[in-house]
């Protein structure tokens, strides 16, 4: 006997030994094509130990799992409904073979049984393309670990497997599990529904509890990744001790539960997400009740979201609000009556030989246990039941297509698993107003519901309060929830309260949800879309008050025509302009008279013309500064004013030279007269002033500048020169020197003839200019803003008036009111008198 033959014999012997008579007709229905069903009708909740691990556990020794029996009845109901439907698989009878897998204890033996022939032989072959298994498809099991165990076998044969409640994301891997499909949304959508629920109620500080199995670890990790993207923080995550099917909970595990619940008590988080099979939660919630941890929102994963046994712990109502994520409720007409009155037990069909049976096909107490929960099962709606129901119909529609059925007959033939799998992928039909088809990952896009646990017997124990649509990835139809809080207010679960508008976050600790709120300072604002942790400075032309989310334009301040000080100075400048113009006319009409000639002759007209130009520059101080107005302020006006002062200084020097220095230095005086000394001096001073002006403009520029008012930051001062005080000292340095020179020469000529003695007038003009300039610089060091501009303009106009009226005014007075003194004879007599006094 070869090795291959020995292997075949060994498998045959194993299957034959494990085969036992079925005692419950609910588990088997003969038909042309059989469906395999794997359901958890029992679960180990008492820690019954099997010492011999080679022995298949006897599931009936465990406690009845009501939901599992309910789902098994859904499969039976769907098969019988299809068999009674003349439009679907006409003339073909579907049968089923159902096995209790005891949650996760009994998976391998049923799979081998389903894969084997009727004689319990599973041959070893190189090619299974033409292999005929006992069943054409398998419905179940219910949890991810069991599904992966079963799928690893069935995928080798490409035997279709449709699970109705396993949500693990790894099951979407069609390379590993090419024959696996499911009629429930994946964990990706379950977790997204949870996250959107938290976002809707603004919960960003949560606790995550997971089981120690693959289901808990994987889904806990997926949830953590999703929460991190949405700035939702996990206060802490703990692993619940898993209730092993064949073990009692140890003292260490119980102490672990005590520690976890104590940690819940100490935490400020009030939203608890639990990813765990229902079997692991009975002891946990008993400990929660013992420690009286209340006031929390519990978010249940689909594994226990609608568990009637846990719901039967009515004391849970005192712990807080229970919300669960589960598949949508689709009422199935007639199913409740079928579940309640369906057969419970009966002898197996006599036609089945003993070798065709398998173990764990009995449940003596299932119907009685189900009847005790019948009300809650009926009120809770057909949720996972519809997933089983639609899975059976998906196989039926695939068979209908594969057998080439029409409205009356089907062509019965051998169906190979891989052929049926191809057709299942193609199905697209409507079942109870819902479209059933499989996406590329093998999932059906049924929407999810958020349910709230209710303990009022007059209400649905699992009341739907919101819906989640996988295709849109949106949470919709959110209804009012009965919260456990006073006045039914939405519970708060945040590490830190939300910051007010215009407050930045200062992190506290490692969690982004824990922070202090700090007001943004004036001049800064908070842009929530860019950075919630730093206040951004406003642009230079904008400002903000404290705790602002935006800036506003600063108020631009400059001299305006409608202001009273501006009007007053403008009127004063107009008076000076008209006075200077009148003086110019008077001097022009009396050009050849001694007074005009003694005042400088042609030089007077140059001074008066420049004074008129200077008065005309006054309006450029009003209004927003421009390049042109700044040029007039910084170049034209200083140049005009300097030439005027230089004329006075040169004229004073010339008079002193004529009367006092000509006799002492005749040669020097002759050079002065011969080479037009006054005009050469004025030209030199003008060039020097132009150099000073150009240097000043190169240093400061001509473009208007803005600066913030230090006393009122919301105001922006617009000026031609940001450093006007220093610039003023530089530009007026020559003018101040000339004023001192002019004053000195005027003082030296105080004894000259009265007609030529201008000491009083020059002293008045130059002293006023010197004093006003020094006062202006002092004022600018103490004040700023538009007030400096108005004072500067006022001083400028007064300096012009001092020259116009202080220097030229007395001469006009003499010309108009003392014409007898404006004669050559009078001037000669005054000179002779001065000469005689000196002698």
Curated annotation (Swiss-Prot):
Keyword Ribonucleoprotein: no
Reported function: Putative taste receptor. TAS1R2/TAS1R3 recognizes diverse natural and synthetic sweeteners.
Glycosites: 84, 248, 292, 312, 368, 407, 428, 487, 527
Cytoplasmic side: 588-602, 657-681, 749-760, 806-839
UniProt keyword annotation of Transmembrane helix present: yes
Naturally occurring in which organism (per UniProt): Pan troglodytes (Chimpanzee)
Topology of the protein relative to the lipid bilayer: Multi-pass membrane protein
Subcellular location: Cell membrane
InterPro entries, per database record: ANF_lig-bd_rcpt, GPCR_3, GPCR_3_9-Cys_dom, GPCR_3_9-Cys_sf, GPCR_3_C, GPCR_3_Ca_sens_rcpt-rel, GPCR_3_CS, Peripla_BP_I
GO molecular function: G protein-coupled receptor activity
TM stretches of this protein: 567-587, 603-623, 636-656, 682-702, 728-748, 761-781, 785-805
Protein name: Taste receptor type 1 member 2
Complex formation: Forms heterodimers with TAS1R3.
An individual GO BP term: detection of chemical stimulus involved in sensory perception of sweet taste
Family, similarity comment: Belongs to the G-protein coupled receptor 3 family. TAS1R subfamily.
Signal sequence annotation: 1-19
PROSITE patterns: G_PROTEIN_RECEP_F3_2, G_PROTEIN_RECEP_F3_4
Entry keywords, A to Z: Cell membrane, G-protein coupled receptor, Glycoprotein, Membrane, Receptor, Sensory transduction, Signal, Taste, Transducer, Transmembrane, Transmembrane helix
GO CC list: plasma membrane; sweet taste receptor complex
Extracellular side: 20-566, 624-635, 703-727, 782-784
Domain of life: Eukaryota
Pfam families: 7tm_3 (PF00003), ANF_receptor (PF01094), NCD3G (PF07562)
PANTHER family in the record: CALCIUM-SENSING RECEPTOR-RELATED, TASTE RECEPTOR TYPE 1 MEMBER 2
């Amino acid at each position: 006997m070869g090795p291959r033959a020995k292997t075949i014999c060994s498998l045959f012997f194993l299957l034959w030994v494990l085969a036992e008579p079925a005692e419950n007709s609910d588990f088997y229905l003969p038909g042309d094509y059989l469906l395999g069903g794997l359901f958890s009708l029992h679960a180990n909740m008492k820690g019954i130990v099997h010492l011999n691990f080679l022995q298949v556990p006897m599931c009936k020794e465990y406690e009845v799992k009501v939901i599992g029996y309910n789902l098994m009845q859904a499969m039976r109901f769907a098969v019988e409904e299809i068999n009674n439907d003349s439009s679907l698989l006409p003339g073909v009878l579907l049968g089923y073979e159902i096995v209790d897998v005891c949650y996760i204890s009994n998976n391998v033996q049923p799979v081998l049984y389903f894969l084997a022939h009727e004689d319990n032989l599973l041959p070893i072959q190189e090619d299974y393309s033409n292999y005929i298994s006992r069943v054409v498809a398998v419905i179940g099991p219910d949890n991810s670990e069991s599904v992966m165990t079963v799928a690893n076998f069935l995928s080798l044969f490409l035997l279709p497997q449709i699970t109705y409640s396993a949500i693990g994301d790894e099951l979407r891997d069609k390379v590993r599990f090419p024959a696996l499909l499911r009629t429930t949304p994946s964990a990706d959508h379950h977790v997204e529904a949870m996250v959107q629920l938290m976002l809707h109620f603004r919960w960003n500080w949560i606790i995550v509890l997971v089981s120690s199995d693959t289901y808990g670890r994987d889904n806990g990790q997926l949830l953590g990744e999703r929460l991190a993207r949405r700035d939702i923080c996990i206060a802490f995550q703990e692993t619940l001790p898993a209730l092993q099917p064949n073990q009692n909970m140890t003292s260490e595990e119980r102490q672990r539960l005590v520690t976890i619940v104590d940690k819940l008590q100490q935490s400020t988080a009030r939203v608890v997400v639990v990813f765990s099979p229902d079997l692991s939660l009975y002891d946990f919630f008993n400990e929660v009740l013992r420690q009286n941890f209340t006031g929390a929102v519990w978010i249940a994963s689909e594994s226990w979201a609608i568990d009637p046994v846990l719901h039967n712990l009515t004391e849970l109502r005192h712990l807080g609000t229970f919300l669960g994520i589960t598949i949508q409720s689709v009422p199935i007409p007639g199913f409740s009556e079928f579940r309640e009155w369906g057969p419970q037990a009966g002898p197996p069909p006599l036609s089945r030989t003993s070798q065709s049976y398998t173990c764990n096909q009995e449940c003596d107490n299932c119907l009685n246990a189900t009847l005790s929960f019948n009300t809650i099962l009926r009120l809770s709606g057909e949720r996972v039941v519809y997933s089983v129901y639609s899975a059976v119909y998906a196989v039926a529609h695939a068979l209908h297509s594969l057998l080439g059925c029409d409205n009356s007959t089907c062509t019965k033939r051998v169906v190979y698993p891989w052929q049926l799998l191809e057709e299942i992928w193609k199905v697209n039909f409507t079942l109870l107003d819902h479209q059933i088809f499989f996406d590329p990952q093998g999932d059906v896009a049924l929407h999810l519901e958020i349910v709230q646990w209710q303990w009022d017997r007059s209400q649905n124990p699992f009341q739907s309060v919101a819906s989640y649509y996988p295709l849109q990835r949106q949470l919709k139809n959110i209804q009012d929830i009965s919260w456990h809080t006073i006045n039914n207010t939405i519970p708060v679960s945040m590490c830190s309260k939300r910051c007010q508008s215009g407050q930045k976050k200062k992190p506290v600790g490692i969690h982004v949800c824990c922070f202090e709120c700090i007001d943004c300072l004036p001049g800064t604002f908070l842009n929530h879309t860019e950075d919630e942790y730093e206040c951004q400075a406003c642009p230079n032309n904008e400002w903000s008050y404290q705790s602002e989310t935006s800036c506003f334009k600063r108020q631009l301040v400059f001299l305006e025509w409608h202001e009273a000080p501006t009007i007053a100075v403008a009127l004063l400048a107009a008076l000076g302009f008209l006075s200077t113009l009148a003086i110019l006319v008077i001097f022009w009409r009396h050009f050849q008279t001694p007074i005009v000639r003694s005042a400088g002759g042609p030089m007077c007209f140059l001074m008066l013309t420049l004074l008129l130009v200077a008065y005309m520059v006054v309006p450029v101080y009003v209004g927003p500064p421009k390049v042109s107005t700044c040029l007039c302020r910084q170049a034209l006006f200083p140049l005009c004013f300097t030439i005027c002062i230089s004329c006075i200084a040169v004229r004073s020097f010339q008079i002193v030279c004529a009367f006092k220095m000509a006799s002492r230095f005749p040669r020097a005086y002759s050079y002065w007269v011969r080479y037009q000394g006054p005009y050469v001096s004025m030209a030199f001073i003008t060039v020097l002033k132009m150099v000073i002006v150009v240097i000043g403009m190169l240093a400061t520029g001509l473009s208007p500048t803005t600066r913030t008012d230090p006393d009122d930051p919301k105001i922006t001062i617009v000026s031609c020169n940001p450093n006007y005080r220093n610039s003023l000292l530089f530009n007026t340095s020559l003018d101040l020197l000339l004023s001192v020179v002019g004053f000195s020469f005027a003082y030296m000529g105080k004894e000259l003839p009265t007609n030529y003695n201008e000491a009083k007038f020059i002293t008045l003009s130059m002293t006023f200019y010197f004093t006003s300039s020094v006062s202006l610089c002092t004022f600018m060091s103490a004040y700023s803003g538009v007030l400096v501009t108005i004072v500067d303009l006022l001083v400028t106009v007064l300096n012009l008036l001092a020259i116009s009226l202080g220097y030229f005014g007395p001469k006009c007075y003499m010309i108009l009111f003392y014409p007898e003194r404006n004669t050559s004879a009078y001037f000669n007599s005054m000179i002779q008198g001065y000469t005689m006094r000196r002698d």
